[in-house]
């Protein structure tokens, strides 16, 4: 797996690939992970300043990629998450695909063809190359997209496109239910610093609700929020606490702006909330409209009044929270769990180029028309394959 970050730190890696490592090994694959950044580099890359340390991390990352070249021959597949390097043209992608004839499975779970640079790395933004995404799509053996919007983009350049949703393990990890029989409820938001800005969308509604009701707001993140609200509990995210901290909450929030970048989001916050039986209120944008069923497992909110009224309904009715939460969990088990997606994920590594993976998660969208539906029984697997993950 060619990834950007060290193992066990990035949600897009943990829940899109690392989650399946045991499954791959069980099916005869030898798995190796190669990250661009080491742990020291990861610790500074999203912080302000540290220019010299960031430059050192970039240099080490490129050296690591160069050292891959003599090793690449032993791998049958390369699972590439986003890009070989965060800056520059797709040199490594071209080299490994065109020169070494490697089968690259190209995965992305954001609209990464759109320019996007964090404030902490504005200088590096001058060297980013979002346009390379379409080239990598053209060259890839297979493309794995986190939602239908991303798949439709990739389909412009490559017929071999797979809908591969982000999933959680609902049996071994996300296997507890939130307790809704509490005197004081807690409203949750979880995410990284890059999505913390969206929480401001809910601020006015939450402020009004706090004038009438007594509740806590729990923010699970790697950066403290800056909100003019009372009863905020900031919890620094760790892999060890992500489930237990969320499971102590009763309502989940997923606000987004209505734009192309949000269309590329894969709804992971909702998947986390609902897997734990937490009904959710979200913006009606992108994949949120597929995950949330209005009034069944959550509510949509696109104005201050929507946020206020939807959250208020859930604050006032514990039975409604329980019912919607259980319904949401059932949907996550059926459509967004590790167990439901195992065959779909394994089929990524079919050696038959005509195999394009199925939408195992029933949908009525146009994507069903453009992706051939095949079952895992039709896949051809080479046991004892070496897989660079």
Which residues does each PLM region occupy?
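A short, well-ordered alpha-helix in the C-terminal region of glycosyltransferases
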Residues: 313, 320-335, 341, 347, ...
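Nucleotide-sugar-dependent
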Residues: 85, 197, 240-275, 282-290
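C-terminal alpha-helical cap of glycosyltransferases
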Residues: 338-389
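Conserved acidic donor-binding segment of nucleotide-sugar-dependent glycosyltransferases
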Residues: 294-305, 313-319
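Donor nucleotide-sugar binding/catalytic pocket of nucleotide-sugar-dependent glycosyltransferases
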Residues: 35, 105, 112, 138-175
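Conserved catalytic-core segment of nucleotide-activated headgroup transferases in glycan assembly
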Residues: 8-23, 33, 167-174, 180-248
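Membrane-proximal helix-turn-helix segments that form the acceptor-binding/catalytic region
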Residues: 62-75, 88-100, 106-107, 112-115, ...
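Acceptor-binding helix/loop patch of EC 2.4 sugar-transfer enzymes
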Residues: 37-51, 104-134, 169, 183
């Amino acid at each position: 797996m060619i990834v950007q970050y060290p193992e066990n730190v990035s949600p897009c890696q943990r829940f899109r690939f690392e989650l399946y490592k045991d499954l791959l090994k069980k099916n005869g694959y030898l798995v190796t992970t190669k990250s661009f950044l080491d742990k020291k580099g990861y610790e500074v890359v999203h912080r302000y300043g540290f220019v010299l340390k960031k430059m050192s991390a970039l240099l080490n990352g490129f050296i690591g990629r160069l050292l891959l070249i003599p090793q690449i021959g032993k791998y049958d597949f390369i699972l590439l998450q986003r890009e070989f390097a965060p800056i520059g043209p797709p040199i490594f992608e071209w080299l490994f695909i065109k020169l070494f004839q490697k089968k690259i499975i190209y995965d992305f779970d954001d609209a990464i063809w759109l320019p996007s640079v964090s404030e902490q790395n504005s200088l590096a933004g001058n060297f980013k190359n979002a346009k390379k995404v379409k080239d990598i799509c053209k060259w890839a053996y297979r493309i794995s997209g986190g939602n239908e919007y991303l798949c439709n983009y990739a389909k412009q350049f490559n017929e071999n496109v797979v809908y591969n949703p982000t999933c959680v393990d609902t049996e071994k990890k996300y296997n507890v239910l939130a307790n809704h029989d509490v005197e004081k409820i807690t409203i949750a938001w979880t995410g990284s610093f890059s999505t913390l800005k969206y929480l401001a969308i809910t601020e006015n509604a939450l402020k009004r609700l706090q004038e009438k009701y007594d509740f806590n707001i729990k923010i699970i993140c790697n950066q403290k929020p800056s909100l003019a609200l009372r009863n905020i509990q900031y919890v620094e995210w760790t892999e060890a606490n992500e489930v237990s901290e969320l499971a102590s909450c009763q309502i989940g929030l997923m606000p987004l702006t209505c734009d192309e970048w949000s269309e590329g989001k894969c709804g992971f916050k909702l998947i986390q909330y609902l897997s734990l039986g937490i009904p959710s209120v979200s913006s009606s944008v992108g994949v949120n409209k597929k995950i949330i069923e209005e009034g069944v497992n959550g509510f949509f909110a696109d104005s201050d009044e929507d946020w206020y009224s939807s959250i208020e309904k859930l604050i006032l009715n514990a039975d409604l929270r329980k019912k919607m939460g259980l319904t949401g969990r059932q949907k996550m088990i059926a459509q967004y769990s590790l167990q439901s997606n195992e065959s779909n994920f394994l089929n990524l590594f079919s050696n038959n180029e005509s195999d394009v993976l199925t939408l195992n998660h029933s949908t009525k969208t146009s994507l069903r028309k453009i992706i051939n539906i095949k079952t895992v029984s039709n896949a051809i697997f080479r046991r004892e394959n070496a897989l660079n993950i």
